[in-house]
Amino acid sequence: MSIPNNLRYSEEHEWVKTEGNEVVIGITHFAQGELGDIVFVELPEVGATIEADEPFGSVESVKTVSELYAPVSGKVVAVNEELSDQPELVNESPYEGAWMVKVELSDASQVEKLLTAEKYAEMTNQD
């Protein structure tokens, strides 16, 4: 699967899509592939504050449990409730159906500090 050019990426394998003063966050195709079949997703409550580089949830796969690290700081304004009933969406559609949270940014400049698709591809040795 190609790496979408319209997103930014963290070194912890989260992606960020900017929508005005909000961002949508999920995990990358590379990350879900490394984790294997996802069986459970734990996400914060709407209204919670998340801090860049700090854990904000976790994903459990048949192999392991992995923390999700916030690529930006802000207030959670929406959570993808479908993932509680269908965690496998993370494997099936990491960039579309399996977004995890929407966050109102506290500092929009944090997005610009994230990796471009090209830099993320280099980091993960993907074409």
UniProtKB/Swiss-Prot annotation:
Record keywords, A-Z: Lipoyl
SUPFAM superfamilies: Single hybrid motif
Highest taxon in the source lineage: Bacteria
Matching Pfam families: GCV_H (PF01597)
Domain Lipoyl-binding positions: 22-104
Gene Ontology annotations for the cellular component aspect, listed alphabetically: cytosol; glycine cleavage complex
Biological processes annotated in GO: glycine decarboxylation via glycine cleavage system
The keyword Nucleus appears for this protein: no
NCBIfam families: gcvH, PRK01202.1
Entries under HAMAP family matching the protein: GcvH (MF_00272)
Function in brief: The glycine cleavage system catalyzes the degradation of glycine. The H protein shuttles the methylamine group of glycine from the P protein to the T protein.
Subunit structure and binding partners: The glycine cleavage system is composed of four proteins: P, T, L and H.
Family: Belongs to the GcvH family.
Protein name (database record): Glycine cleavage system H protein
Gene: gcvH
